[in-house]
């Protein structure tokens, strides 16, 4: 018997961390919610990270997902910005782990491939495909749309992982 799994996708960022929640039952995906947690740019880094943690913790408590997926960060030429993004990503990994959720991580190209079929694409393509895959999905920001794409990617990958485990059990 298949069970419904609620997944939160998280797109980490220091200014805005997007979140998107979907339910997966077999091949079926259902939109549950999405949004953005923000931090005040006028505050010190530690306070901003606390704001992100508190915001994500509230979302996790409200929606009670079963699993989490977080996007890997990319390295850019600005080392300071990359470091700050890495710290925000640490919060994105920590909050669901503290809530007892298994946390998967996906490269941006893997997310794009799962949602639009190729590893390279424009954000607009991703947002459009999120709406195609889940017509009831709504998102106010690009970060929330990206988070939904991350959740969709995890839903697809977790099915592959489960199938591989079943196959392994049959062979053993």
UniProtKB/Swiss-Prot annotation:
Keyword Cell membrane attached: no
Known catalytic reactions: Endonucleolytic cleavage at a junction such as a reciprocal single-stranded crossover between two homologous DNA duplexes (Holliday junction)
Residues at the catalytic site: 11, 71, 143
Binding positions for Mg(2+) 2 per the UniProt entry: 71
Enzyme kind, highest EC tier: hydrolase
The enzyme's E.C. designation: 3.1.21.10
GO biological process: DNA recombination; DNA repair
Cofactors (names): Mg(2+)
GO CC, one annotated term: cytoplasm
UniProt KW keywords: Cytoplasm, DNA damage, DNA recombination, DNA repair, DNA-binding, Endonuclease, Hydrolase, Magnesium, Metal-binding, Nuclease
Assembly information from the UniProt record: Homodimer which binds Holliday junction (HJ) DNA. The HJ becomes 2-fold symmetrical on binding to RuvC with unstacked arms; it has a different conformation from HJ DNA in complex with RuvA. In the full resolvosome a probable DNA-RuvA(4)-RuvB(12)-RuvC(2) complex forms which resolves the HJ.
Protein name stated in the entry: Crossover junction endodeoxyribonuclease RuvC
Organism, scientific name: Brucella anthropi (strain ATCC 49188 / DSM 6882 / CCUG 24695 / JCM 21032 / LMG 3331 / NBRC 15819 / NCTC 12168 / Alc 37) (Ochrobactrum anthropi)
Name of the gene encoding the protein in the UniProt record: ruvC
